[in-house]
Amino acid sequence: MTAMVMTACTGQKAEKAEATQDNFNYVVDQFADLQILRYQVPGFESLSLKQKQLLYHLSEAALMGRDILFDQNCRYNLPIRRALEAVYTGYKGDRTDPQFVALETYLKRVWFANGIHHHYAEDKFVPGFTPEFLRTCISQIGASALPLREGQTVEQFVAEISPVIFDPAVMAKRTVQSGDVDLIRASANNYYGEGVT
């Protein structure tokens, strides 16, 4: 009854709002097996300044926690993500090149899954670009843009992350649950650190 009264009282405004909602594009991006969606947030404008500030600080806290989750999922996730982001932002070549498009898709999957493993299956992503393409891109962006450890060269960094990205046997699954192996050593997650049994 209330809905009928509200619609009857507002007349054209209700029709206009309905048309706006019908034309709203929910899909932001689509890649691999994923769709990134956006949602309408009716009433946001009517929130108080204090409520908006709370939302802002909660979103900032979520961003800070994001790196923790990346690190917990695999010890190489942060260096790989940061290197891929540096390549993505610093790439000077043709962005329609299939190798670059594949790198972009891989990076988006890493962002979505908080690491190099699928968010549900926990299997490692298979990159659609070659190790040579990644090596060339990383060498072109320079050491200052990379997450190098103290004393580590660009070549050493590439040699360290390449097997993690490209070798299907290295850190193949985020969490191994098969009973016939050492679950902690076989899993790629980073809850225990290196050498902990």
Predicted regions and their residues:
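C-terminal motif of bacterial Sec signal peptides marking the signal peptidase cleavage site
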Residues: 5-8
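Bacterial signal peptide processing site
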Residues: 10-13
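N- or domain-start disorder-to-order transition segments that initiate the globular core
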Residues: 16-18
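N-terminal helix-rich structural modules
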Residues: 20-197
